[in-house]
């Protein structure tokens, strides 16, 4: 099993090209099921979860072709299976996003209950309740969600009991081919949801309220393929910016989207970073100074993203002063904390809050990645640790970061993959 070894770094310096967003690419690939003609997705990152999504589409009978240059073509002409099996779904929670498209276009879907990161229950009941309101008959049996609808799904009014990105995406895709108008209230506003909505519009969907908590979808008879470019990955961008801040460096992220990262950029400025942005780039300069501690509290977009929480734990662990990090989205999302403590970090956990007292340097150690973002935080920690840090179980990292060691090497870091 692959590992990463990281040695203490000089301040990171240079330019890094940001990949397409995993969390936008996955639902957009699933949306290919809705299209009656060829659908081409560009700026698709080369990641384990993307490979799994393509395998899932092939399993359903779709034709999936890698066109090179981060472009994938999907054809559903021969799609003739409507079951997403356990052996694929167990490795990736986003597989649940095939449910809405299959049901909307074909009237039937069997989807294994999902797996993926071990960071809390993330219940699928919001997905199922919304589809039931649209007329689907659903039962959960033998580990599978079995959904059927006679004719087309029906437009309806859905109020989400809690903000859920995945449920919003599933219902948005289902509503695009429903009979009548669907209104989703308390919808997720994340940029990845907005990206999916723009993709559906390019396919012929009628959606208003994009970027707000109320989405209105007028169902159409059919959707057609198009070519759509996936948005830049805001979490990858934020991770590299934090790495530069921690190492007191200066980097520029290109092919990025500053507008999707405002809460993170604001906190980096609070930490002492000088931030400069253009239309598609972000530059961070620490002027050689140690970052200052910051308080963060995760919440749905446009507030601070839960997927940047672990990285800011590392920033606070190496900052001047004491910072508080509060997690409100997922339970069990501080699994990186014991590993950081093994590296010498001074962290106290009180429920869903960590109180982090900054120190000047960590110590290299052998640590274990427990989920995707935790693994990124451990790599960043290794950049400011005396000696060598080894991160095990980096298959988590490969689910969400494209060519991460090569990108760090390009910024001057000693990050090496060991087979």
Swiss-Prot record:
Its main location: cytoplasm. GO terms for biological process: cell division; cell wall organization; peptidoglycan biosynthetic process; regulation of cell shape; UDP-N-acetylgalactosamine biosynthetic process. Keywords: Cell cycle, Cell division, Cell shape, Cell wall biogenesis/degradation, Cytoplasm, Peptidoglycan synthesis, Pyruvate, Transferase. It is found in: Cytoplasm. GO terms for molecular function: UDP-N-acetylglucosamine 1-carboxyvinyltransferase activity. Its EC number is 2.5.1.7. The active site is at 117 (proton donor). It comes from the Bacteria. It holds the Pfam family EPSP_synthase. It catalyses: phosphoenolpyruvate + UDP-N-acetyl-alpha-D-glucosamine = UDP-N-acetyl-3-O-(1-carboxyvinyl)-alpha-D-glucosamine + phosphate. The modification 2-(S-cysteinyl)pyruvic acid O-phosphothioketal is found at residue 117. Belongs to the EPSP synthase family. MurA subfamily. This is UDP-N-acetylglucosamine 1-carboxyvinyltransferase.
């Amino acid at each position: 099993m692959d590992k990463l070894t990281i040695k203490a770094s000089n301040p990171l310096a240079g330019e890094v090209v940001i990949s397409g967003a995993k969390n936008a690419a996955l639902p957009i690939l699933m949306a290919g099921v809705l299209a009656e003609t060829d659908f081409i997705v560009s700026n698709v990152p080369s990641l384990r979860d993307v490979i799994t999504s393509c395998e899932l589409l092939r399993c359903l009978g779709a034709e999936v072709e890698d066109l090179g240059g981060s472009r994938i073509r999907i054809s559903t002409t021969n799609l003739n299976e409507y079951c997403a099996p356990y052996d694929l779904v167990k490795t990736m929670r986003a597989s649940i996003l095939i449910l809405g498209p299959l049901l909307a276009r074909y009237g039937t879907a069997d989807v294994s209950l999902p797996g993926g990161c071990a960071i809390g229950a993330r219940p699928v009941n919001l997905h199922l309740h919304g589809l039931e309101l649209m007329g689907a008959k659903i039962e959960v049996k033998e580990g599978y969600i079995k959904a059927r609808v006679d004719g087309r799904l029906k437009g309806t009014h859905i109020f989400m009991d809690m903000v859920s990105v995945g449920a919003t995406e599933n219902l948005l895709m289902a509503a695009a081919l429903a009979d009548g108008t669907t209104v989703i209230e308390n919808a997720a506003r994340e940029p990845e949801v907005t990206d999916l909505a723009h993709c559906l519009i390019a396919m012929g969907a009628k959606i208003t309220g994009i970027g707000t908590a109320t989405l209105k979808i007028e169902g159409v008879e059919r959707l057609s393929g198009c070519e759509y470019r996936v948005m830049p990955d805001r979490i990858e961008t934020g991770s590299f910016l934090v790495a530069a801040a921690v190492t007191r460096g200066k980097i520029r992220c290109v092919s990025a989207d500053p507008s999707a990262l405002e809460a993170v950029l604001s906190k980096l400025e609070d930490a002492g970073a000088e931030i400069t942005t253009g239309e598609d780039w972000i530059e961070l300069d620490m002027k050689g100074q140690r970052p200052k501690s910051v308080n963060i509290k995760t919440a749905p977009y446009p507030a601070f993203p839960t997927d940047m929480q672990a990285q800011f734990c590392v920033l606070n662990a190496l900052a001047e002063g004491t910072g508080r990090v509060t997690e409100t989205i997922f339970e069990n999302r501080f699994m990186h904390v014991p590993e950081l403590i093994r590296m010498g970090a001074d962290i106290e956990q009180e429920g869903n809050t960590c109180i982090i007292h900054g120190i000047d340097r960590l110590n290299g150690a052998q640590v274990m990645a427990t989920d995707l973002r935790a693994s990124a935080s451990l790599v960043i920690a290794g950049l400011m640790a005396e000696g060598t840090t080894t991160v095990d179980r980096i298959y988590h990292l490969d689910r969400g970061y494209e060519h991460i060691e090569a990108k760090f090497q390009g910024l001057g870091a000693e990050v090496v993959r060991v087979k």
